[in-house]
């Protein structure tokens, strides 16, 4: 066994800090994350440096502010001169791997993300579950199993929630499988692995068997204060009508209380899916005899408004639910 500790870096996408039972959410079903909270150190006042993906990821992978990395919004690319922690560890003799999302450069409209010298090898890239790129390794994995992502989509619950693929075909399960394969293959060497699933990022599409664990009627309504509209800028008021001010995508203003509760249940169900996959990985560490020599970091790139202040998804809104 290496005397240098292994590092398992689990980063989810758009997960609020208050989605874990051990941190006070009585509706959460997160036994494996609870174990990490109880056995480790929890940073309850940690704030990401931007409430959207790319600048936040560029910041925590370099230890520098978005204004310094010059990656200040989605669609911008991190300069090649910026050095990632994965490259530093690779230079120090660590075997570094990744499964899932990186998002340090633009990758929309079928354009594959351009990499810098990031030190990752293997690099199992899947920006999100949708098969928008031939290079999406999750899509390739589904095809190897005789599955098509579109065919795996389930029924619509309402205008805001639908069933996604069964858990065994989810991108989160694929990320866990790649992580476990790496852990077992690299035993005895110092390694660093980045697990970067897309969940619980919208769309709100948990597997049916996970949403069935939650009763939407039990979910709390978002925290909203109608009077605050009088003091907010126009772009924030527009986000209260359509999420991301994108007419036709997610009509926030038209939601009923039942719709809001259903979204909350779906979001929490996606977190439970993550929790189960984290449990698989922790079990693999134990079974391979590497648990005692592995530092496990669990975090998210930023949070989710989830209806608080009348807003869904994310954006230029500096509230705790997006930053902690």
Residue ranges and their predicted role:
Residues 1-324:
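Formylglycine-dependent sulfatase
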């Amino acid at each position: 066994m290496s005397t240098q500790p292994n590092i398992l870096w689990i980063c989810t996408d758009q997960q609020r800090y208050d989605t874990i039972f051990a941190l006070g959410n009585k509706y959460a079903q997160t036994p494996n994350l609870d174990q990490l909270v109880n056995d480790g150190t929890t940073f309850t006042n940690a704030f990401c440096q931007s409430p959207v993906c790319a600048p936040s990821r560029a910041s925590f992978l370099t230890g520098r502010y978005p204004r310094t990395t010059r990656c200040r919004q989605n669609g911008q690319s991190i300069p090649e001169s910026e050095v990632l922690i994965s490259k530093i560890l690779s230079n120090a003799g660590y075997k570094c791997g990744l499964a899932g999302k990186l998002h340090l450069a633009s990758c929309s409209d079928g354009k594959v993300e351009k990499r810098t010298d990031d030190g990752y090898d293997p690099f199992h890239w899947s920006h999100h579950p949708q098969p928008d790129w031939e290079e999406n390794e999750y899509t390739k994995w589904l095809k190897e199993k005789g599955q098509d992502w579109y065919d795996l989509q389930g029924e619509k619950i309402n205008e805001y929630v639908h069933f996604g693929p069964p858990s065994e075909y989810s991108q989160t399960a694929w990320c866990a499988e790649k992580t476990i394969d790496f852990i077992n293959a690299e035993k005895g060497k110092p390694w660093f692995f980045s697990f970067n699933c897309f969940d619980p990022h919208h769309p709100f599409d948990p597997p049916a068997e996970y949403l069935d664990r939650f009763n939407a009627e039990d979910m709390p309504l978002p925290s909203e204060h109608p009077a605050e509209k009088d003091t907010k800028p126009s772009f924030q008021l527009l986000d209260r009508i359509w999420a991301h001010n994108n007419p036709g995508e997610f009509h926030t203003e038209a939601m009923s209380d039942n719709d809001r509760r259903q979204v909350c249940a779906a979001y929490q169900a996606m977190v439970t899916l993550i929790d189960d996959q984290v449990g698989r990985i922790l079990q693999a560490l134990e079974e391979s005899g590497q648990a005692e020599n592995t530092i496990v970091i669990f975090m998210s790139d930023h949070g989710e408004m989830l209806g608080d202040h009348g807003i869904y998804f994310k954006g230029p809104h500096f509230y705790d639910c997006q930053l902690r």
